[in-house]
């Protein structure tokens, strides 16, 4: 059984790379991890993760997709598949791999053959009505995150409205609010990973 793979999707600037950086920083002493970033023409996100995060550079792979970002995570996952295979061969102890998509629209989803779980993140600055649009990325993800809550007063967004809209389309699926700049709400994300993804409750039983 190989490492668990978590897809991280969302629009440009929503906080995908920062989310991976914050999670890996918090779990570095608990879990053996690696990360893969996807972008169209650069590996800038991989460089940022290596410079600002705690993962060794050799555990971070940047992929230049050269086309539509969601193709590499859904229709043709071959580049990501190869990156995962390479990481597993180099680090047999891997328990968790994050696959960050390139910035994409609200309909982007991960192939179930590529990842085991997925997170979709948006930010408040994109507008109060974004959750109401209920794109497939927000609906189908295992965890939905509304990030940059601190910006709500400055962009005229009502967080209560966003929460109610999220409840309506998420039904019983989890979602949370975060301000990753200050780690506010990160505890909810970590709790989800520990208990829903890593299933620590079962391991400790």
Swiss-Prot record:
Main subcellular location: cytoplasm
GO biological process, one term: urea catabolic process
Gene3D superfamilies per UniProt: P-loop containing nucleotide triphosphate hydrolases
GO cellular component, one term: cytoplasm
Keyword Chaperone among record annotations: yes
Alphabetized Pfam families for the sequence: cobW
Highest taxon above the source species: Bacteria
InterPro entries the UniProt entry points to: CobW/HypB/UreG_nucleotide-bd, P-loop_NTPase, UreG
Subcellular location: Cytoplasm
This protein's UniProt keywords: Chaperone, Cytoplasm, GTP-binding, Nickel insertion, Nucleotide-binding
Molecular function terms from GO: GTP binding; GTPase activity; nickel cation binding
Induction of its expression: By urea and nitrogen starvation.
Residue numbers binding GTP: 10-17
SUPFAM superfamilies in UniProt: P-loop containing nucleoside triphosphate hydrolases
HAMAP family per record: UreG
Family membership: Belongs to the SIMIBI class G3E GTPase family. UreG subfamily.
Job of this protein: Facilitates the functional incorporation of the urease nickel metallocenter. This process requires GTP hydrolysis, probably effectuated by UreG.
PANTHER family documented for this protein: UREASE ACCESSORY PROTEIN G (PTHR31715:SF0)
Quaternary state and interactors: Homodimer. UreD, UreF and UreG form a complex that acts as a GTP-hydrolysis-dependent molecular chaperone, activating the urease apoprotein by helping to assemble the nickel containing metallocenter of UreC. The UreE protein probably delivers the nickel.
Name of the protein in its database record: Urease accessory protein UreG
Chain's gene name: ureG
């Amino acid at each position: 059984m190989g490492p668990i793979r978590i897809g991280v999707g969302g629009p440009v600037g929503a906080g995908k790379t920062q989310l991976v950086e914050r999670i890996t920083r918090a779990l570095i002493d608990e879990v053996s991890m690696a990360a893969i970033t996807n972008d169209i023409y650069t590996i800038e996100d991989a460089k940022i993760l290596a410079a600002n995060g705690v993962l060794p550079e050799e555990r971070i792979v940047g992929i230049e997709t050269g086309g539509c970002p969601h193709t590499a995570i859904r229709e043709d996952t071959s580049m990501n598949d190869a990156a995962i295979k390479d990481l597993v061969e180099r680090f047999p102890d891997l328990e968790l791999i994050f696959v960050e998509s390139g910035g994409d629209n609200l309909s982007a989803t991960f192939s179930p053959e590529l990842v085991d779980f997925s997170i979709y993140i948006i930010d408040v600055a994109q507008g109060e009505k974004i959750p109401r649009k209920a794109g497939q990325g927000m609906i189908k993800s295992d965890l939905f995150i509304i990030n940059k809550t601190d910006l709500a007063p400055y962009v005229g967004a009502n967080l209560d409205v966003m929460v109610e809209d999220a409840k309506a389309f998420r039904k019983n699926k989890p979602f949370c609010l975060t301000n990753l700049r200050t780690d506010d709400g990160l505890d909810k994300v970590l709790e989800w990973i520990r208990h829903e993804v890593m299933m620590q409750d079962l391991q400790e039983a």
